[in-house]
Amino acid sequence: MDSKVTSLVGAALIVLLMGGCYEKKNGGAQPVKAPSLESTATPPVPMTGVVSESGEIQYHQNTPLVNLPVLKLYLGKATLNAELAISLKELATGMMFRKELEENAGMLFVYPFVSDVAFYMKNTYIPLSCAYIDAEGIIQEIYDMKPLSEESIPSKSDKIRFILEVNQGWFEKQNIDPGTLITTEKGSLSELFPLTTYR
């Protein structure tokens, strides 16, 4: 699934200009530069960034994302290995063009801001469940998403910072509901991905 880039494109571009990811080394938080379009973990692939015949501007690549960093997440008693989508290309491409997803795997979308969001399933073949998560790592909303649907599913909250996609039904099987706090093997989401104040 990819994010509906509409109102988020400008803000997502900020990802390319800031170090949005932190990892702990020797007991302290050390900044890690967020990947840019030129320095992603994936090799160069065909990308669109121009107006298509339909008049839509597309920022996603035309093949599945590969070699993304993985972070272990803890959701209550459940654990999940989540790929990290941070750069504009990664946020726009998401799970597009993939045909399978391991049972306890997912993708965590990391935005450098808090906002309302809207996701859809363009070019996404896997049935997914999507959690909208606030800046503290608390799940606010969970939705089941229909493969290949271009109908946006907007958040009710305007305080969303992260989005977690998993196989459809995974949250229900694990008894995970809104209100569940997500932590990681390296600390809280807010510690790993600090917000930047924009003026």
Q: What kind of feature is each model-predicted range?
A:
Residues 17-20:
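C-terminal motif of bacterial Sec signal peptides marking the signal peptidase cleavage site
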Residues 10-14:
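Hydrophobic helical h-region of N-terminal Sec-dependent signal peptides
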Residues 1-9:
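Bacterial N-terminal signal peptides that target proteins for export
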Residues 22-199:
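Compact, glycine-rich, soluble single-domain proteins
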